[in-house]
Amino acid sequence: MENSLWKQCLRRLEQEIPDQQLNTWIRPLQAQEEEDRLRLLAPNRFVLDWVKAHFADRITELLSAQRPDRPPRLELQIGSSAVVAPPRRRQVSVTTPSPSAAADQTPATRSAASNLNSNFTFDTFVEGKSNQLARAASMQVVENPGTAYNPLFLYGGVGLGKTHLMHAVGNAMLRRRPEARVLYLHSERFVADMVKALQHNAINEFKRHYRMVDALLIDDIQFFARKERSQEEFFHTFNALLEGEQQVIMTCDRYPKEVNGLEERLKSRFGWGLTVAIEPPELETRVAILMSKALQEGVDLPHEVAFFIAKRIRSNIRELEGALRRVVANAQFTGQEITVEFTKEALRDLLALQDKLVTIDNIQKTVAEYYKIRVADLLSKRRSRSITRPRQMAMALAKELTSHSLPEIGDAFGGRDHTTVLHACRKVESLCAEDSRIEEDYSNLLRTLST
């Protein structure tokens, strides 16, 4: 039976929801259509709960718009349908690849002239709230190089996708104009090339090399700190490129003005274009990243496993993908199915280390310092808003970042009942949805505790 209702809904949702969210939550749903209802079957409890919480209302609206006289009833269940089975992905092979075969697959395909990694594209970049602006700005640079945002400055912690985005811009530029001169390099390479040019009395050739490009993509500019001659040369190169409307993209591990040992004139010029932060990915994006990576590798990763890994690994994408590689490798070597229990065992030492690093005591100290109150205030019976709100934040963070039960968390906060902790978690969730300042506070605390 053709699911015309669901197909129409899906077409609308495809216009409204980013691809990674569609692939993670919507496309796994299987539809069963009857006269007065549309039943959507989710592959597991995680997908079911997420769809109910985030998409059910919108799907109901779309159904009502299609049949305003007799709106079909939406039903969400766990199950599967042989009629609308999703395409299967390859299962994890239990055969250990030979070292030579593995070596052939490991190096990324690169362009010798540009140093670009052709695997880093916009298609393989998973978009989320944490990197949405950075991706949009990068796309604009591709559309209008040298004029839209010049320079484009991306900053954020290690392993958050800054380099991926920079390569994606370069690759997209070359697809549009294969003759374009796009050069990617690490700032350390710029310094090394300059030193070599000085040693061989070839500084003019060095200048021509870096100033005759259409786009210069330079990674980790914090490496220039306290290197006065390198900063001097880059300053003039930077000016020459901007005067010629040649695109400059830079990355850094922190906001440019926070880089000690970097000349003020450079910091000032870096702010001429657009400066964008990339934050650690939120839970939904982390799940999408894992599912996307598994799909690229041809691995059938259950949603509940992706959800488990994403809940426990929060710091950056590099560690997230590293955890996935470890789980997949263990499955290959042992021939076992990837389940949540198998994943817990495969990541046992990693999770144990994380549990040691993030404790309720650490959370209480961090929250107290953030709100400029005492830890004793968090544990007290005081109920003023200046104390209650930080206490609720700390309880919610303890629930998210540790494996302690609600009663254990309540006990650590002055012997409170588990229902108090549950209320605090729900309160923080609703406040974050309503107040962007509280959401920012929570994100800041989460980032501090996770890195």
From Swiss-Prot:
Residues 85-112 are annotated as: Disordered. Residues 1-82 are annotated as: Domain I, interacts with DnaA modulators. Residues 115-331 are annotated as: Domain III, AAA+ region. SUPFAM superfamilies: P-loop containing nucleoside triphosphate hydrolases, TrpR-like. This is Chromosomal replication initiator protein DnaA. InterPro entries: AAA+_ATPase, Chromosome_initiator_DnaA, Chromosome_initiator_DnaA-like, Chromosome_initiator_DnaA_CS, DnaA_C, DnaA_dom, DnaA_N_dom, DnaA_N_sf. ATP binds at residues 159, 161-163. The lineage of its organism: Bacteria, Pseudomonadati, Pseudomonadota, Gammaproteobacteria, Chromatiales. Gene3D superfamilies: 1.10.1750.10, 1.10.8.60, 3.30.300.180, P-loop containing nucleotide triphosphate hydrolases (3.40.50.300). GO terms for cellular component: cytoplasm; plasma membrane. Keywords: ATP-binding, Cytoplasm, DNA replication, DNA-binding, Lipid-binding, Nucleotide-binding. It comes from Alkalilimnicola ehrlichii (strain ATCC BAA-1101 / DSM 17681 / MLHE-1). Domain I is involved in oligomerization and binding regulators, domain II is flexibile and of varying length in different bacteria, domain III forms the AAA+ region, while domain IV binds dsDNA. NCBIfam families: DnaA.
